[in-house]
Amino acid sequence: EISRCDWSSDVCSSDLALHLDHGTYEGCYKCIKAGFTSIMFDGSHYPIEENVEKTKELVAVAHQLGLSIEAEVGSIGGEEDGVVGMGECADPNECKAIADLGVDMLAAGIGNIHGKYPANWKGLSFETLDSIQKLTGQMPLVLHGGTGIPEDMIKKAISLGVAKINVNTECQLSFADATRKYIEAGKDLEGKGFDPRKLLAPGAEAIKATVKEKMELFGSVGKAE
């Protein structure tokens, strides 16, 4: 159940977006109704014809309400039931078909996966990314599974049109590591160190530090000014 989200300019001095990640067709409509400012429709598991049909419908609805919309072509790999699936490389022509619908951002599989990358990961397919960029023009491309991708690959991906990079697992790992150190140091046993606000504070600060580091790497600092 998703409740109504009310936004206030007093929350933060920078521009904010409440974005749905990997939304289903039904989930997108729920989040639109709830007040999200941006949605992602992940139709990559549908045949391309159905992905196009559903994306086209959601583009019209989102833009009528002033929302941005991200779409996906080519499944992003990841771990499920202990098995790591390697990411697919999207068909550049299918990417163009989705981009031509007027989406604001396009997530395309280029060998990237969610979560930790296995030792035998072959890396990003820059050949695929280059082909997609040439066919989609100025379309902002999205790279999911940003955790663990080497810096040189990140920078090359940005040079080839990637404008949004998702990083989640690395933030979670930073949080877990900082929280673990707090407890192992016995700080939860000092005074009211067991208070969740104190117990979780180091983890929250660790996430902030990780995000700051990524913003600097991605060239995102100062873009909201």
PLM features: residue spans?
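Single conserved hydrophobic/aromatic residue that forms the stacking wall/gate
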Residues: 1-11
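Charge-dense, low-complexity intrinsically disordered segments
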Residues: 3, 45, 119, 201, ...
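Small/polar loops that bind or transfer phosphate-bearing groups
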Residues: 4, 20, 145, 167
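Alpha/beta enzyme core
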Residues: 9, 22-137, 151-162, 173, ...
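Glycine-rich nucleotide/cofactor/substrate-binding loop typically near the N-terminus or early
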Residues: 16, 20-22, 177, 186
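Structural detector of well-ordered beta-strand residues that form the stable sheet scaffold
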Residues: 17-21, 69-70, 142-144
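Active-site proximal loops enriched in glycine and acidic residues that flank catalytic Cys/His/Asp
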Residues: 110, 145-147, 169
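C-terminal alpha-helical cap/extension of soluble enzyme domains
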Residues: 150-225
